[in-house]
């Protein structure tokens, strides 16, 4: 057999093996418990990554904003924290008093130290220590809510007003939102002369 024939056979064998492994892997159905575990793992990773950002920004730059018409660094992160809790509350049907931008009952029978009103506009929450507290707490609450939701209910439809989707979709939207706003702050950190944290993909 010629060298080229051997090479072709080896290539065919490799492709067949890869296809077989792919088919075998794709045949493994993921369970609701596995999805929940992945949600928790990703939220824990996201918390660590966001804390990297918060720690990287100098305390005296938390009020920095690239242009006057947008949120400061502190406000971006406080908005992230507020919506971490809000969207996950929607996902699990936890009692919500009103739409974001107005007053929200953060306590709801729990001992959560949130200021009244919309968090990012709280004058007492803008310092580095306060922002880190609220952001860190928001991730803990999100993880708590996810752990408390039976994966068998992921397909149920829920929402607020006319905005309806599955619980699973709301959980995805909550994660997407915090990723978006953390990403927006990358340029804030660069503009004050600090190197942003490296990605935490795993």
What name fits each language-model region?
Residues 111-157, 169-177:
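Acidic/histidine-rich alpha-helical segments that form the ligand environment
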Residues 1-7:
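N-terminal secretory signal peptides that target proteins for export/translocation
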Residues 56-63, 144-155, 191-196:
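Surface-exposed helix-capping loop/turn segments at secondary-structure junctions
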Residues 29-40:
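Short, low-complexity N-terminal intrinsically disordered segments enriched in polar/charged residues
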Residues 40-44, 48-51, 63-115, 157-202:
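Short, contiguous alpha-helical
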Residues 49-52, 56, 141-145, 184:
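Solvent-exposed, charged/polar functional surfaces in cytosolic regulatory/catalytic domains
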């Amino acid at each position: 057999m010629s060298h080229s024939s051997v090479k072709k056979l080896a290539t065919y064998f490799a492709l067949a093996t890869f296809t077989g492994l792919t088919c075998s892997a794709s045949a493994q159905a993921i369970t609701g418990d596995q999805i929940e575990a992945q949600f928790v793992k990703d939220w824990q990773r996201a918390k660590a990554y966001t804390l990297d950002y918060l720690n990287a920004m100098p305390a005296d730059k938390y009020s920095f904003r690239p242009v006057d018409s947008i949120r400061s660094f502190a406000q971006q992160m406080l908005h992230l924290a507020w919506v971490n809790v809000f969207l996950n509350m929607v996902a699990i049907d936890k009692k919500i008093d009103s739409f974001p931008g107005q007053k929200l009952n953060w306590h709801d029978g729990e001992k959560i130290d949130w200021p009244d009103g919309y968090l990012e506009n709280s004058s007492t929450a803008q310092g580095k220590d306060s922002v880190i507290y609220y952001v860190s707490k928001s991730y803990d609450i999100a993880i708590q809510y996810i752990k408390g939701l039976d994966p068998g209910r992921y397909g149920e439809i829920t929402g607020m007003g006319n905005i309806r989707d599955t619980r699973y979709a709301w959980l995805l939207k909550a994660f997407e939102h915090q990723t978006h706003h953390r990403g927006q702050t990358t340029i804030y950190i660069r503009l004050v002369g600090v190197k942003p944290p490296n990605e935490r993909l795993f």
